[in-house]
Curated annotation (Swiss-Prot):
The gene is queC. Its cofactor is Zn(2+). Catalyzes the ATP-dependent conversion of 7-carboxy-7-deazaguanine (CDG) to 7-cyano-7-deazaguanine (preQ(0)). This is 7-cyano-7-deazaguanine synthase. It holds the Pfam family QueC. The keyword Protease does not apply. It is an enzyme of class 6 (ligase). It catalyses: 7-carboxy-7-deazaguanine + NH4(+) + ATP = 7-cyano-7-deazaguanine + ADP + phosphate + H2O + H(+). It comes from Pseudomonas putida (strain ATCC 700007 / DSM 6899 / JCM 31910 / BCRC 17059 / LMG 24140 / F1). Belongs to the QueC family. Zn(2+) binds at residues 189, 199, 202, 205. Its EC number is 6.3.4.20. Keywords: ATP-binding, Ligase, Metal-binding, Nucleotide-binding, Queuosine biosynthesis, Zinc. ATP binds at residues 10-20. GO terms for biological process: queuosine biosynthetic process.
């Protein structure tokens, strides 16, 4: 039987941890990729390593990037405050072209591994309004992936899988719990402290808390 491999973007948060569990349940050998890109804290990278170990991935890779050299986001520029109240439009926590960059590197690793599937935990229901989380973006990237790679041109097509795309945060939590995700290992907060404790005020914290509440499941998040 041929091994079914997948590269999965793993941030260390709730959504990406759920995606790893979903891919594993579908019989994939999971290769996870995280990025040290100049974000506000390293707690999410520590969380990603914990999740990768707990879910038994084949290999977990951390890639260094200097997106803080570009700036333009509250997540990569410490002079921009993380908003603690809902606002209009695309928030300042949007990191310019982040998912495009991350998926491009995942695509490269997938080609090396001869993996045909790349998973990403984007969501367009309970989300912050980022343009690179929409179905149109995922579909467009998949088309590009199959035009821009040796494997794609030779007919070994790639699939960009976004299984959470149309799920509510409550549904995501329920799906993860059903597949054995330990959410106490994850960190979602935009401004978590070094110990991984959350602020409870940012948009990501609100979405996470609302998801657990709507799912009727106890939230294991620790706050500072």
């Amino acid at each position: 039987m041929t091994e079914k491999r997948a590269v999965i973007l793993l941030s260390g948060g709730l959504d990406s941890a759920t995606v790893v569990a979903m891919a594993k349940a579908e019989g994939y050998s999971c290769y996870t990729m995280s990025f040290d890109y100049g974000q506000r804290h390293r707690a999410e990278l520590n969380a990603a390593a914990r999740v990768a170990h707990d879910l038994g991935v084949v290999e977990h890779k951390v890639i260094g990037l200097n997106l803080d050299g570009i700036g333009g986001s509250a997540l990569t520029d410490s002079s921009i405050d993380v908003p603690e109240a809902p606002g209009e439009g695309i928030p300042v926590t949007y990191v310019p072209a982040r998912n495009t960059v991350f998926l491009s590197l995942a695509l490269g690793w997938a080609e090396v591994l001869e993996a045909r599937d790349i998973f990403i935990g984007v969501n367009a229901v309970d989300y912050s309004g980022y343009p690179d989380c929409r179905p149109e973006f995922v579909e467009a990237f998949e088309r590009m992936a199959n035009l821009a790679t040796k494997a794609g041109v030779e007919g070994q097509g790639f699939r960009i899988q976004a299984p959470l795309q149309n799920m509510s945060k409550a549904q995501i939590v329920q799906a993860g719990m059903a597949r054995g995700v330990d959410y106490s290992l994850t960190v979602s907060c935009y401004q978590a402290d070094d110990d991984g404790r959350a602020c409870g005020k940012c948009d990501s914290c609100r979405l996470r808390a609302d998801g657990f509440k709507a799912a009727g499941i106890e939230d294991p998040t620790r706050y500072f």
